[in-house]
Amino acid sequence: MKIGQVSRKYGLSKDNIYYYINYGLLVPPKLNSQYVFDDETIRDLEEILALKSMDYSLSEIHRIISLHRISSIESPGDKRELMDMYSDKRAECAVKVKHYEAVIKDLDERIMELATNEPAVQRHTGLPLSMLNLLCCPECGRPLEISDVNMDMEYIYDGRLTCSCGYHAVVDDGIVITPNGYNGEVDKPDLTRELYKDLPPSLISLFQRSYNYMKEELEEMDLSGKVVMETYINAWFFLHNHQQCFSPKGFYIVVDKYPETLHMYKDLIERENYELPILYLADSSTEYPLKEGCVDLNLDFFAVNEHNFYHDTFLLSCLRPYFRPDGRILGTYFYFENGRESMKELLGTYPQCSASNFSLTYFRKETAAAGFSLDKNRVCGYTTDSGNNLGFSFHHKGEKMYLMSYDGHLESGR
């Protein structure tokens, strides 16, 4: 047979076959400068493939093939050597089998734990009655009236929120949905978490370093009775991944422009059952039906960046009216160092994106202009490759994207 026929019959690439020849495993005769695979060479190839299936290395296979070629295993010494090689491989496999049996047992336990970890009855939540006092009309500031209510002693599940000035919103499955829906075409609700897929391990490690900083700062805070807000969760949602860091005696406001994203996360949070009182708010603006001066802490993981995808304004300036006089900010800002090509790609994909997005100078300047002072910050590192994923498709390989975590407060008198 010719090499092409051998390749097709045994499902091997020609490069593989040539490698075996160059390695000395196969020694086919030549006819007119072309290799011819006679019966003996084919037997050698089949033996090589059989030994490979037994996890022998090429050097071990070469030794076994050589023993057959030199002595045909007639010598007692060669027989003993071959038996020893088989016995050693058998012992090696027995160790692996024992190891894999233990691995299978551990995996079975993990699968069983996940299968049985579902709560017998999933807790269903709504708009907490304890947080109704945070709501007001965003147009005139008056209290909202509620009607057509489906509720119990703890939550409102459905209803209508109205004001005499004409403002109205609805409560749908516990989510407050305002008239400010998103009608753009450059984004969509990420219900299957495409943003998380195909992130390279190096970037995930960078995320974790920033998470660690934010968790360290949270450990120093007493959030009992405090109101914590996080916006733009369709991109990244810090609170969801770190619910164990938050007090069930606090109050939490979660905002996104997509009701679908809020419904998805609400269902997950109900399954996880950390019993955090959460007001879910669907609104694509920053004119929320919230009282001024009600927020103690704002969480930001990419939210400031995400806001600038669609607005030329600075998110913390827009949220400023909702902060208490002693309000705090905790987050992670993403910025480029000389990211000219990445920003060109970003601005081409998102026509409404601010040209100041991903700029550390812009972030520091606008944070101060909004009346906030950064108490601490930590540059957690940078990546030059965000991988092939939806979340950072605009990031050009080679350009440095940094993550800076920060903690700050609203300056008195501002």
Feature-to-residue mapping (PLM):
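Basic helix-turn-helix/winged-helix DNA-binding cores
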Residues: 1-60
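Arg/Lys-rich, alpha-helical DNA-contact motif
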Residues: 40-117
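Class I SAM-dependent methyltransferase Rossmann-like catalytic core
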Residues: 175-224
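Class I SAM-dependent methyltransferase SAM/SAH-binding core
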Residues: 224-287
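A short, conserved alpha-helix within the catalytic core of class I
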Residues: 306-319
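Conserved beta-strand signature within the Rossmann-like core of class I S-adenosyl-L-methionine
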Residues: 325-335
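Short, glycine-/aromatic-enriched active-site segment of Class I SAM-dependent methyltransferases
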Residues: 333-354
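Short alpha-helix
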Residues: 354-377
